[in-house]
Amino acid sequence: RMKKEDPIKTAKKVEEWLDIVGLKGFGSTPTYQLSGGMQQRVALARCLINDPELILMDEPLGALDALTREKMQSLVLKIWKETGKTIILITHSVEEALLLGERLYVMAPRPGRLHKEYTLPFATMGLTGDLREIKNNKDFVSKREEILSMIWNMEEEIMLSLIHI
């Protein structure tokens, strides 16, 4: 509707994207009848049907259970590979950021600012490998611990400065 396309073409694109996100046959199901993971996939398909150059995902997987989250992470990587779209993912999950990002930016709090940037190989590895294996990769574990320690130390510094006020 937004682009005033032919309704038949639009319906075909809807079916294609629902199939890609694993929801073939759910096109006429009301959203409220879908599980949380299915609703997230509908939201992703709804975004992608408009063929944006950039996809902004703000905490898209935070409310999902562990299994559904892992499936959605694989789906995001698959869509990234197949479409070549730029995806900006905002998340509080260090592990998720490491798995899905080519670049990771750690923000420092109060005031919010860029603290450190990382270039990562794990998303590319995830295109061909098992995400669970990547999570156990020694480089992945090391990077996760480095970032978590950095964040922990920043939080401690803030708490100490608040105590001394």
Language model feature labels by segment:
Residues 69-83:
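Helical segment within the ABC ATPase nucleotide-binding domain
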Residues 7-26, 78:
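Conserved ABC ATPase "signature" region
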Residues 163-165:
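Conserved small/polar residues in nucleotide/adenosyl-binding loops
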Residues 29-32, 50:
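Conserved signature/switch motifs of ABC ATPase nucleotide-binding domains
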Residues 44:
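Hydrophobic anchor residue at the start of the ABC signature
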